[in-house]
Amino acid sequence: MANNWLNNRKRRPTHPGEVLREDVLPAAGLTQDKLAKLLGVSRRTVSEILHERRPVTTDMAHRLARAFGTSPEMWLGLQQDVDLWDTHHARRKEYEKIKRVPAPKAA
């Protein structure tokens, strides 16, 4: 089943904001204000990401990757896992009603 990891996982994947808040910023000695200036975005944008109220977009992933020597894919991968989890759990019953299309028969 394609969604097996979503069904078997006991908790929501870690939001990239939590990674920034708990690991990256303390290690770098950065505050929200300093990070906002470094990234060229508003403090509100940074705060909303750190408090998991805003997703990491492709633009923000590039900014974070540049600032911390990582890749945009790393940040987007974290966000994608959260997005898939949230959507799956919010709409699981709806998705269960969708019938699978049978595989084509071999010629």
Feature names for model-found ranges:
Residues S42, R53, F68, Q79-V82:
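The DNA-recognition helices of helix-turn-helix-type DNA-binding domains
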Residues P16, S71-P72:
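Hydrophobic side chains within well-formed alpha-helices
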Residues R53-R66:
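Short, basic-rich loop-to-helix N-cap that marks the start of a DNA-contacting helix
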Residues L25, A36, A65:
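The alpha-helix within a helix-turn-helix
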Residues W5-L30, G77:
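A short, Lys/Arg-rich alpha-helix, primarily the initiator
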Residues L30-E48:
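Short alpha-helical DNA-recognition segment
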Residues M1-N8, P102-A107:
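Intrinsically disordered, low-complexity and often Lys/Arg-enriched segments
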Residues L76-A107:
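Short, charged recognition helix plus adjacent turn
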